[in-house]
Regions:
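Glycoside hydrolase catalytic-domain context in secreted enzymes
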Residues: 4-300, 306-322, 337-691
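Extracellular and select intracellular beta-sandwich modules with Ser/Thr-enriched
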Residues: 323-327
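Short beta-strand edge segments in extracellular beta-sheet folds
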Residues: 328-338
Length: 691
C-alpha cells in the first residue's frame, strides 16, 4: 500500500516502532556501520511526516529470535499479548488506514490480525542496517516491492504438523547412553515430508499466507510454455509489466507428480527466476531449466531418486495454492533418476501422517537402547596408506599453491604433533586476536602455513567491529533472486578480506521445519530447492571473490532446545527428500571449501561421527573435496576420536586437551597417522586458495 496514493503524507506511529529490530542474535548477529530508527527514517524520507491527527497508522509488532533459544507458543512470542490485541482493535476502529508492520524473525499468530480488516500487512523480517529506510521507501512509493514469502504462515501455530513433535518437553531426559554418550530429547519427525506448503496444500488446509505470496505496485502478466526432454524440464515464461509502475516479478515453477503408494506432497516447488526491472509495457522471457531429480522422490527400498509412472502437471505462478497448469506429460514406467548410497537409516518405522493429514498420536519409540546404534554397525571408516616420507628440498604451502601435485610430499613433511595441531581449531570464545573472529587454524613457520581466521557471517562479517549488516537469510530468500544472493556473498568476501578473515562460516542451509526454531532468520526457507539454490549462489559469491564458504549444518539442525543432544528420528525418505536435498541441490550448483556438521544426533549417530554421511554421501556421491569441521563444541556430546576417524577434519573450537587426545589415540592405535595425513591434506587443499 503506497501511503501517498491513498491519504496524503501524514502517518501515526503505534506499537513497538522504537524497538524496530534489524538483526537476529548469535551467529547471524550484525554490528552495523550505522542505522536509523523508524522516526529518523520517516524524517529523512522527505515524503512522509509523523502527525497525531493522521488518517493512516503504522502499527509495529516486534519479536526477537536467534541462536541458542527457540521461540515459544506463548503470548509475547508466537501469540499476541492481550495489550497488543487491545491496541490493534483500537487502532482499527480509529484510523481510516491501518498498516500492520510485522517486525519479526519468524511467522507469528495471524488469526486475530486477519480479522482486523487492516489496509495492509507488511513483514519486514530482520532487514539489516537499512531496514527502517527500506520500509519507509516502500510505503511512500520510492521503491516497488517484489518479494514473496519463502515460508507458509499458518493461522495458528498448532495448525502446523511439526508442532506436535518440535520440543518434546515431556521426554527431555536421556533415552539411552552408549559408552557414556548422552542422547537428549527425542524429536520424532512424524510429519515426514509434509512441511510448510507441502502440508497445507496437499491436505487443503487453510493458511494465513502460502509460500510464494507477495504483492507489488505493478501488474504483471505471464505467458508460459514447457517441455520435458532428456531429463530436463524447460519452462519458458514471458513476463509483461502491464502497469505504469516499473517493477520486478519472479516466476515460480511447481510440478504435481503421481503420489504412488506412499503419502507424498500434492506438488513440489522445483525452480524459479526473476526478471530485471521492467518499465510499462516491457517484457522479458525467462528460461528455467529444471533437472528431473528436482521433482523426483526418494525410494529407500532401492536407494534411488525416482519418477513414478503417471501424469505430471507443470504449474507456474507465485503463491503455492494459486498456480496454473501450463502443460502435462505422462511417464509410462517408473524412471530412476539417480542411484544413491544409504545413510542415517532409521531404526524403527516412523508412523507418519494419515490420509487426512493428521499426525498420528501413537509416536514412534526407540524401545531398545542399542537398536539405533546397531543399524550403523555396518558403516566403516575408510583406511589410508601412509604417505611416503619426502626427503627432498623443503616444500612450502606456497609451492603447493603453484603446483598441487606437490601436496602429498608437502603433507609428508608434517610431524605427528603438527598433524594433530592442524586437526584442532586453535582458538575459542570468538576472540582470536581480540578481533572477535570465531576461530583460527593452526600455523607453521617451518612449513610457511600462515595463521588463517574464520568468522560467522550469513549476513555480515561478525566481528568486534562494525561491518555492513545485510538482511537475514529468510528475508534474502523472499527475493527469489539468485544474482542478489551472489552479490551478498561478494560483499561479504570483500569485507572479510578487509578484516583478515579467510573462511566464512556460512551460509546456513537448514530448513524451516518448524516456524519457532530460534535460528529461523539465519536459514532461508521451508523449501529445499529454494534454500539449496540460494546458499549455492551466496557461497559462489564468497569464493569467487577470495573467501572460503561453509555449508552448514549437516544435517537436520532444526531446533535449538538441547541442540547438542536432541535426537532426531527421521525416516530415510524424508531425509533424502527434504533435509539432505538442500545440500544435494547446493552441491549440484557449487561445491564450497568447507562443510560444518550439526550438533544433533540423527537416527542413533552424531553427524560428525557418521562415516557413511561424510564419506559415502558427502565426498563420493556429492563430490565434495574440501574439509569438514564440527560445530563449536560438538565434542561436549559427540566423541572426538570417532569423529576424526569418520572423516571430520577439524575439531572446533578445540584446545590443548583435544590435541593431546589425538596423540594418545594414535599411540593406542585408535587412529592412524595415515588418517591424520589424509585429513590434513583436505585442509591444505582449501588453504592454498586463501594465500
Amino acid at each position: 500500500m503506497c501511503i501517498r496514493d491513498s491519504s496524503g503524507s501524514s502517518i501515526k506511529l503505534l506499537g513497538a516502532y522504537n524497538d524496530f529490530r534489524i538483526t537476529a542474535i548469535g551467529a547471524s548477529l550484525i554490528k552495523p556501520r550505522w542505522t536509523l530508527t523508524v522516526p529518523e527514517a520517516v524524517e529523512r524520507s522527505g515524503a512522509l511526516s509523523i502527525c497525531d491527527n493522521a488518517e493512516t497508522a503504522l502499527f509495529f509488532i516486534s519479536r526477537g529470535s536467534g541462536e541458542n533459544k527457540d521461540n515459544r507458543p506463548i503470548k509475547g512470542e508466537y501469540y499476541l499479548t492481550d495489550e497488543e490485541k487491545a491496541a490493534l482493535s483500537e487502532a482499527a476502529a480509529k484510523y481510516k488506514n491501518l498498516i500492520i508492520i510485522l517486525n519479526t524473525g519468524y511467522p507469528i499468530e495471524m488469526g486475530f490480525i486477519r480479522g482486523l480488516g487492516a489496509s495492509a500487512v507488511i513483514w519486514t523480517g530482520f532487514s539489516g542496517q537499512r531496514g527502517s529506510e527500506s520500509l519507509i521507501d516502500i510505503l511512500c512509493g520510492k521503491v516497488n516491492p517484489s518479494g514473496r514469502l519463502a515460508d507458509t504462515w499458518p493461522i495458528d501455530y498448532y495448525d502446523s504438523p511439526s508442532a506436535k513433535n518440535f520440543i518434546n518437553l515431556d521426554d527431555n531426559s536421556p533415552i539411552y547412553s552408549d559408552d557414556g554418550k548422552r542422547f537428549g530429547a527425542s524429536v520424532y519427525y512424524e510429519e515426514q515430508e509434509f512441511v510448510g506448503y507441502r502440508y497445507f496444500d496437499s491436505f487443503k488446509k487453510d493458511a494465513a499466507y502460502y509460500f510464494g505470496r507477495g504483492l507489488s505496485y505493478s501488474d504483471f502478466s505471464v505467458r508460459s510454455s514447457a517441455s520435458f526432454e532428456s531429463g530436463i524440464l524447460r519452462v519458458s515464461a514471458e513476463v509483461t509489466n502491464n502497469s505504469d509502475v516499473p517493477g520486478k516479478d519472479s516466476v515460480l515453477v511447481y510440478v504435481k507428480a503421481p503420489r504412488g503408494n506412499e503419502p507424498r506432497p500434492e506438488k513440489l516447488f522445483c525452480g524459479f527466476e526473476k526478471t530485471a526491472l521492467l518499465k510499462k509495457g516491457e517484457r522479458q522471457t525467462l528460461t528455467i531449466d529444471i533437472p528431473q531429480k528436482d521433482f523426483s522422490h526418494y525410494d529407500k527400498n532401492i536407494h534411488a531418486f525416482i519418477l513414478s509412472k503417471g501424469q505430471y502437471d507443470v504449474m507456474v505462478g507465485g503463491e503455492a495454492d494459486k498456480i496454473k497448469t501450463i502443460c502435462s506429460f505422462v511417464l509410462e514406467d517408473d524412471v530412476v533418476c539417480e542411484k544413491t548410497v544409504s545413510v542415517c537409516r532409521e531404526a524403527e518405522k516412523i508412523t507418519g501422517v494419515d490420509e487426512n493429514g493428521n499426525v498420528r498420536t501413537d509416536k514412534t519409540k526407540i524401545t531398545e537402547a542399542k537398536k539405533a546404534i546397531a543399524v550403523h554397525a555396518e558403516y566403516t571408516s575408510p583406511s589410508y596408506n601412509a604417505l611416503p616420507r619426502y626427503s627432498g628440498s623443503p616444500i612450502t604451502l606456497s609451492d603447493v599453491k603453484e603446483d598441487l601435485t606437490k601436496l602429498d610430499d608437502f603433507v609428508s613433511q608434517f610431524s605427528l604433533r603438527e598433524l594433530a595441531d592442524f586437526t584442532v581449531c586453535n582458538g575459542s570464545c570468538w576472540n582470536p586476536g581480540k578481533s572477535g573472529a570465531a576461530g583460527k587454524l593452526a600455523s607453521s613457520k617451518r612449513l610457511d602455513v600462515p595463521t588463517l581466521y574464520m568468522s560467522d557471517g550469513n549476513c555480515c562479517v561478525n566481528l568486534n567491529r562494525p561491518t555492513t549488516g545485510f538482511p537475514s537469510s529468510n528475508l534474502l530468500a523472499g527475493t527469489f533472486n539468485k544474482s542478489l544472493a551472489y552479490k551478498v556473498g561478494k560483499v561479504l568476501a570483500d569485507e572479510s578480506k578487509e578484516n583478515g578473515i579467510s573462511i566464512n562460516l556460512g551460509p546456513g542451509g537448514n530448513l524451516h521445519r518448524n516456524i519457532l526454531c530460534g535460528r529461523h532468520p539465519e536459514y532461508y526457507s521451508e523449501d529445499p530447492i529454494l534454500t539449496g539454490t540460494l546458499m549455492a549462489y551466496q557461497a559462489r559469491g564468497l569464493e569467487e571473490n577470495g573467501v572460503i564458504a561453509t555449508y552448514k549444518h549437516l544435517i537436520a539442525n532444526n531446533m535449538e532446545f538441547e541442540r547438542k543432544s536432541a535426537h532426531g528420528i527421521i525416516d530415510e525418505n524424508t531425509l533424502r527428500d527434504l533435509y539432505l536435498r538442500v545440500f544435494d541441490k547446493a552441491f549440484s550448483l557449487y561445491k564450497p571449501g568447507c562443510v560444518m556438521t550439526s550438533y544433533n544426533p540423527v537416527n542413533g549417530i552424531y553427524p560428525c561421527e557418521n562415516s557413511a554421511l561424510l564419506n559415502d554421501l558427502l565426498r563420493d556421491e556429492w563430490g565434495f573435496d574440501g574439509f569438514v569441521m564440527t560445530d563449536w563444541g560438538s565434542y561436549d556430546t559427540a566423541d572426538s576420536i570417532r569423529s576424526v576417524c569418520a572423516g571430520t577434519n577439524l575439531l572446533t573450537p578445540g584446545s590443548k586437551k583435544h590435541f593431546r587426545m589425538i596423540l594418545k589415540a594414535v599411540k593406542r592405535n585408535e587412529i592412524s597417522k595415515a588418517a591424520l595425513q589424509h585429513s590434513v591434506k583436505q585442509i591444505m587443499k582449501v588453504l592454498v586458495r586463501c594465500i
